[in-house]
From Swiss-Prot:
GO molecular function: double-stranded DNA endonuclease activity
Lineage, uppermost ranks: Bacteria, Pseudomonadati, Pseudomonadota, Gammaproteobacteria, Enterobacterales
Native species: Escherichia coli (strain K12)
EC number(s) reported in the record: 3.1.21.-
Gene name as annotated: rpnC
InterPro entries named among the record's database cross-references: Rpn/YhgA-like_nuclease, RpnA, Transposase_31
Biological role stated in the UniProt entry: A low activity DNA endonuclease yielding 3'-hydroxyl ends. Upon expression enhances RecA-independent DNA recombination 2.9-fold, concomitantly reducing viability by 59% and inducing DNA damage as measured by induction of the SOS repair response.
Protein name, entry field: Recombination-promoting nuclease RpnC
Length: 300
């Protein structure tokens, strides 16, 4: 059964706390001293909107205020939970609502995160409030959660990782090497390293196909014939470079009529020719006869 959108609790709560003077009294009384000292409650301003999920609006109500905190924008988010039994997920919900308020602040063209102070107003049957208000306590390992979320997040900055180190990364090495250099270098300069990694046998046939098509779309080399020819010779598993028909299927394009397919084939062939590939290799890749490739060459 759908929860009602409003309740008597909802109505009376908002009737009081939507008034600035009443809200100021509430916050002066109930905000912890260390937080109250951060806030200039004379700047308190009621904000529009709600962060409560639709499925919970019959059980929860919220009010959001903006306020200056030590001269910077901040928010106070008050949630009233009017269920008879407290929600075991409430601490996590409060964190999620706070992040939603931060996100809305960023969407308004701000480039810094505001401090959002979540406040729960509880009036349930169980007394005192029986649950922790620390979201870390909801984790299987609260101490580990504190370490993870109170520290900078792990960063894999491949741009500063030496190539020699990347070459030791086994199955992920070929992807990292390409991601590092795809924009900056002629792919021919990577050929020796790519061949070494392919010969080590870590890369599957389907991964090689994906890698080669990625290089065709995003990479650059002045010696495309030699580069792609060498790579084809090193392939394993019997898989060759993706034909255009396969490319169509992967991209969801193989749905049109033959005329549409022919036009896209010619466009693809033109891109390959512009990268310096021979007409024979382009014909194989684009799945077109040499006569069609010659027509494309005449159009370039």
């Amino acid at each position: 059964m759908d929860a009602p959108s409003t309740t008597p609790h909802d109505a009376v709560f908002k009737q009081f706390l939507m008034h600035a003077e009443t809200a100021r009294d509430f916050l002066e009384i109930h905000l912890p001293v260390e937080l109250r000292e951060l806030c200039d409650l004379n700047t308190l301003h009621l904000e529009s909107g709600s962060f409560i999920e639709e499925s919970l609006k019959g059980h929860s109500t919220d009010v959001l205020y903006s306020v200056q905190m030590q001269g910077n924008p901040g928010y106070l988010h008050v949630v009233i939970e009017h269920q008879s039994k407290p929600d075991k997920k409430m601490a996590f919900r409060m964190m999620r609502y706070s992040i939603a308020a931060m996100h809305r602040h960023l969407e308004a063209d701000h480039d810094k995160l505001p401090l959002v102070v979540p406040i729960l107003f509880y009036q349930g049957e169980a007394t005192p409030y029986p649950l922790s208000m620390c979201w870390f306590d909801m984790f299987y390992s609260p101490e580990l959660a504190r370490r993870v979320y109170n520290s900078p997040f792990p960063l894999v900055d491949i741009t500063i990782t030496p190539d020699d180190e990347i070459m030791q990364h086994r199955r992920i090495a070929i992807l990292e090497l390409l991601q590092k250099h795809i924009r900056q270098r002629d792919l021919m300069l990577l050929l020796e390293q790519l061949v070494t990694l392919i010969d080590e046998g870590y890369t599957s046939g389907s991964q090689l196909v994906a890698m080669q098509n990625y290089m065709l779309q995003r990479g650059h080399t002045e010696q495309a014939d030699l580069f792609y020819g060498v790579l084809r010779d090193r392939e394993t598993g019997g898989e060759s470079m993706m034909t255009l028909a396969q490319w169509f299927e992967e991209k969801g394009i193989e749905k049109g009529i033959q005329q549409g397919r022919q036009e896209v084939s010619q466009e693809f062939a033109q891109r390959l020719l512009s990268k310096g590939m021979s007409r024979e290799d382009v014909a194989e890749m684009a799945n077109l006869p040499l006569a069609e490739i010659d027509k494309v060459i005449n159009l370039i």
